[in-house]
């Protein structure tokens, strides 16, 4: 959320999801700069835990765009999707000789921004960076 929210856009976020950010970013990279309808198809055919979380988040952002901002759902594109580190739960696994090995249960914060774009070449310029 480093940049300001645009006028013709809508966003949604979810926090404290029990998935490693590194694994979730693999799925997030698949839908960045894609249309919302194309992103839904990609997420439904991706067999990863993160795809379910991001699909719910994308549907929420589409609902925010249509109901709150009054945008056209067919012209929405994923302009920003972020997966950041959340708090880490630290657990210990007993090991030999009285030792304990640390297990880090990582969590993630997700943020998605959809922008209504009439000219498709605008999004292609952003995707070429």
From Swiss-Prot:
**Source domain of life:** Bacteria
Cite the Pfam families for this sequence.
Ribosomal_L22
Keywords tagged on the record: Ribonucleoprotein, Ribosomal protein, RNA-binding, rRNA-binding
GO biological processes: translation
Does the keyword field hold Transferase?
no
Query: Which InterPro entries does the annotation name?
Result: Ribosomal_uL22, Ribosomal_uL22_bac/chlpt-type, Ribosomal_uL22_bac/org-type, Ribosomal_uL22_sf
**What are the GO MF terms of this UniProt record?**
rRNA binding; structural constituent of ribosome
Note whether Isomerase occurs among the keywords.
no
Sorted alphabetically, the Gene Ontology cellular component annotations on this record are: cytosolic large ribosomal subunit
Quaternary state and interactors: Part of the 50S ribosomal subunit.
Indicate the family of this protein: Belongs to the universal ribosomal protein uL22 family.
User: What does it do?
Assistant: This protein binds specifically to 23S rRNA; its binding is stimulated by other ribosomal proteins, e.g. L4, L17, and L20. It is important during the early stages of 50S assembly. It makes multiple contacts with different domains of the 23S rRNA in the assembled 50S subunit and ribosome.
Provide the protein name. Large ribosomal subunit protein uL22
Q: Which organism is it from?
A: Metamycoplasma hominis (strain ATCC 23114 / DSM 25592 / NBRC 14850 / NCTC 10111 / PG21) (Mycoplasma hominis)
